[in-house]
């Protein structure tokens, strides 16, 4: 699990990121990233719609895998970010490694990792 301070939960927060954030796309994921100078920590929300899979088991697996990947990357992310991750509809179901590689590539492209 992600720590409570790193979770994006409220509808208003998601709406703000969707409206004002910059979009970055990868093979399996789409990210909306908004820099918020008012916070000192990064907050993350994950969205997996029923278009990806009608089965809740599959949608929840994607969310668990992405939370685990973000937990490892949290120390490498810059502070004050609000990130909404959306799993895009895909013909093939990506495994954990493919999701991790795709997410790292998108974050590097967005220049939100330390050292970028």
UniProtKB/Swiss-Prot annotation:
Highest taxon in the source lineage: Bacteria
HAMAP family in the cross-refs: RNase_P
Protein name (database record): Ribonuclease P protein component
A GO BP annotation: tRNA 5'-leader removal
UniProt keyword annotation of Repeat present: no
Organism: Pseudanabaena sp. (strain PCC 6903)
Catalysis performed (reactions): Endonucleolytic cleavage of RNA, removing 5'-extranucleotides from tRNA precursor
EC numbers on record: 3.1.26.5
Subunit comment: Consists of a catalytic RNA component (M1 or rnpB) and a protein subunit.
A single MF term (Gene Ontology): 3'-tRNA processing endoribonuclease activity
